[in-house]
């Protein structure tokens, strides 16, 4: 069972510690480059975003399984139904950032069923997957525990997701508020784009 060296979370930033049946995975979250996606992940992890699967205050990811594991590709989790078909009861737009690519092992990215269908499902890569660039929102990367990612098998559990914030910017990141404001901002941008396309 792998444990996390907490020195890695002493650096400024925002981290998610995913505690699994195989050990811990520590991920640095890209909250400045993908605020909506990170706010969604944190809000669900901490039970602060309204969804149709769990009550407010109840951590969304705790007890869910990695329902899809493909060797030499990725592990996928975050489906409340355990079959890849479930979500939180809402969807939000992609948040593709040019600096964030599926550039190697340990990339945290949103699973989706096409553009604008993000919900709660995410995946972590085993290797570089450039064909996913521009199609899936990258929002973090593993800083410790890639061996755990590689050891995860189908139906292994996410026991708990713990969010750790270091530094003023990270500590001021209010996931529930940011999720709402970023979602509104992206909707307005899409409306303007659609209007200009007429």
Name each region found by the language model.
Residues 1-198:
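Cyclophilin-like peptidyl-prolyl cis-trans isomerases
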